[in-house]
Amino acid sequence: MKKVLSNGTEYIYKNGELPEAIRLGDLKAALIRGNHKSALLKQETIEKAFIVEVNHGYQLPLLPRHALLLPDARASPLGVASQFSINDTGGIIEKDRVIHDLSHEGEVSKESINSMIDDDSLSHCPLVYGHMHSRCVHYIVATRYLYPQARILGSKADYKSAYRRQHLSSKASFHSMTQATLVQSMFILLALRLTFGGKVCPFDWCTISEPVVDLANALLDCDSWDPSSIHSPSQHLVPATKYLPDSIPLAAARELLVDVPVSEFGRVDGYIDDLPTFGPDLSPLHRSKLAAASFLAIHITGRDVSSLDLFPRQSLLASNKLAAEGGLCEALIVLGWLYNTRALTVSLPSHKHIAWKNSITDAIDSKSMLPSELETLIGRLNHMASIMTMSRHFLSRLRYYFDKSKEPNKKYSRIFFNKSVIHDLNLWLLFLDKAYNGISMNILVFRKPTHIYRTDACEYGLGGSFSDGTLWRWAIPHDLLHRAHISLLEFMGMLIPIWMDVLNGSLSLHDCILSLGDSSNAVGWMVKSNFKSAEENLPDQLAKLEVSRTLASLILSEDLILWSQWMCGDDNIIPDICSRDWHLLDNDLINNLTSLFSNSNQQRIPHFKMRPVPKEIDLFLCSVLQKLPKNPLRFKTPKTSGFDPGVDGKNSFSPSACKAMFSWKHLLSHKEMQSVSPSAKPSAKETLKANSKESNVEPYGIPSDMYRRPLSLV
């Protein structure tokens, strides 16, 4: 921190500076090109913003003729991004943010400031704010679980012009030049403070802001701190605590899989310039600490405003937002989501629900969108998918159309959608309504699984087991053989037991599913289906999308949590037997399994029983396979599991295999698999082994910064 504050933010390039001729070529081209279209369309916004910036000493204005005289100068364009903010009373207002696009490539070098940055130079402060939303939700659920009868209160503190509080080094300023029209004259502007668009800026700002969060948490835990006597000068602006009606019951929290430390005085977290605070309402002292800690921490670290300053300065704390967001309450907007700590829900605010729904409805009516509109829509839906992860399965077609619109030599004035995309957009309308009505925090956290499914597949059949010893298997009809590649069959197999339990009524609201399989591709597709494996062709991809959409619809409609995990094939014995041993009738297969367990000297022998695959699922599987052409390259000679004493097979299970079959904890701590996450990506077994060094092993393979804030980051 001392280096950053003393020397300013520096741009360190991995391959050094550009050659002088190339730099000058980039600079001249940038000055001729000017700013992005979004900035040109909002000249008044640019002028208003930069007059304020110049008056506060954040930008240094120069005449255009000075641009080529500055040593090492480089220029990047401005843009304007529209977003929502709140006014002093908490009302939603549209706000334009000026963006300094340091990712824009130079005309000659084909390099941008951001692309040249040496990533190794950014390691001085880890960026943990990306998981702040997840940590807050985990903390709220853990607090309710520990204090089931207590209200949970929250508030939010904001920095005023956060990035403008840290200065750039002189060289970085020369490399952060832009241009704008101010008072009817063109000026060259040197950025003297952190820019909105610089790759380095979040790292250097977090070097300053993360210790402030640490300080706020230290204040909460400090027994000698009396917030009534030591507090921010703006504390009197914080409104009184607001409670939701008692008619709304306190929602119960489900038990977590991970250990989240809960302090009786609450916790503060941080996302760049936002500092949300949450804690239990246990006494007046608890409330007063919760209401003051983050504001005092920001005040302590900021220099007092003085009339002697050469440039007008504002308080580090955004006092204008205190009335709207500073007071303790049970309903608070954090990162664009409405947290209801009483009902334990996260929901899409009404203004976003209306705007986003209108955008989708217009696209459905016209069956088309402008490329810029589609890009905005994808960003919005991806934001929504942060709490409805399974909805990402329905983004792939939209992304495909947007990527097509960017192909070289193709300029699309409008993008026209086919029936499949229109179907996806109609589903997104349902998802938007669901998000607006609220998603339970209990399905947004890492929880102990309530249902465990193990599955396997071969070229001739699918099979698996439930945790109570129930078995299932499905033989691929003869005329549908040799169509699907094995990864797709494995994926279909992982869908079946979930669907069976939904139809059977065995899954309850907010249940947590752990789906286990020995295909890394299929395990990854359970949560992310827009990537393509080497053996896939177009019909394969369409079939995979059909399966993934069916899976996502089940999970979303039933409000379930789905985790998927790879397991070693040697431990996946029962599903392997169910999928391969078609020479055995159901009763013979069950007797064989019972005999194998008996011969393994197991104290607990499962009560095996076979459950038939429902007709609805059978018809779906057949319809998927019927759409695939036969492929001679996918012909495989039938092969049994080898666990059949009647044909000189193995007559018992190994102890480790028996343990793996019925112990999910054994699987979660398995050294070959350190990923239990909704965003898990498929990878080869060798990669999994390479990434399982003891020094990197965390509980159940879940990154700890997803559920608890690291201490003393800087």
Residue ranges of predicted features:
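RNase H catalytic domain
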Residues: 268-272, 279, 499-573, 577-582
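Amphipathic alpha-helical
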Residues: 40, 50-56, 402-442
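Catalytic-core region of right-hand nucleic acid polymerases
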Residues: 41, 45-50, 54-220, 347-397, ...
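C-terminal functional segments of enzyme domains
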Residues: 333, 338-344, 558-617
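Metal-dependent nuclease catalytic cores in nucleic-acid-processing enzymes
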Residues: 135-145, 210-214, 488-510, 546-557
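A short, polar/acidic, helix/strand-boundary loop motif
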Residues: 185-210, 246-250, 362, 467-492, ...
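A conserved non-catalytic segment of reverse transcriptases
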Residues: 89, 178, 186-192, 269, ...
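Catalytic palm subdomain of template-directed nucleic-acid polymerases
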Residues: 107-119, 165-168, 233-307, 341-346, ...
